[in-house]
UniProtKB/Swiss-Prot annotation:
GO terms for cellular component: cytoplasm. Its cofactor is Mg(2+). Its EC number is 2.7.8.7. It is an enzyme of class 2 (transferase). Signal peptide: none annotated. GO terms for molecular function: holo-[acyl-carrier-protein] synthase activity; magnesium ion binding. The gene is acpS. It comes from Borreliella burgdorferi (strain ATCC 35210 / DSM 4680 / CIP 102532 / B31) (Borrelia burgdorferi). HAMAP family: AcpS (MF_00101). One of its GO terms (biological process) is fatty acid biosynthetic process. Coiled coil: none annotated. The keyword Repeat does not apply. It is found in: Cytoplasm. This is Holo-[acyl-carrier-protein] synthase.
Length: 124
């Protein structure tokens, strides 16, 4: 194991995201936003969980960085794998760094009414 990252977020922080398109587009890719629209259940919990996942990855990568990389949270996309679990799809500088370092990323997300939590393990 190279590094870990964890983030916990209050779900209620994301209630106003649904009415604020600019906020949504600041943190989430168009693909993520479309998936939220198609998703049943609690969209707000899902938003919070994906945001926590992005923050967890940043925390996990930070100790590995030998140089500053430019990124936005939209460069870290959280998608559903063919198996149904959450995984990352990286873009731009974050993707280049992960490839250069030959990193393997493992993600788990959980949410329950008030809180969402994500945990990331980084290996190479």
């Amino acid at each position: 194991m190279k590094s870990i990252g964890c983030d916990i977020i209050k779900v209620e922080r994301f209630k106003n995201f649904l009415e604020n398109k600019k906020k949504m587009e600041r943190f989430f890719t168009h693909k993520e936003i479309e998936n939220f629209k198609l998703k049943g259940g609690s969209i707000i919990e899902s938003l919070a969980g994906k945001f926590a996942a992005k923050e967890s990855l940043i925390k996990a990568l930070s100790p590995l960085l030998q140089y500053k990389i430019n990124y936005t949270l939209k460069d870290i996309e959280v998608i559903k794998s063919l198996k149904g679990n959450a995984e990352f799809c990286l873009h731009n500088e974050v993707e280049k760094f992960a490839i250069k370092m030959n990193l393997k990323l493992y993600l788990t997300i959980s949410h329950e009414k008030e809180y969402a939590i994500a945990f990331v393990i980084v290996e190479n």
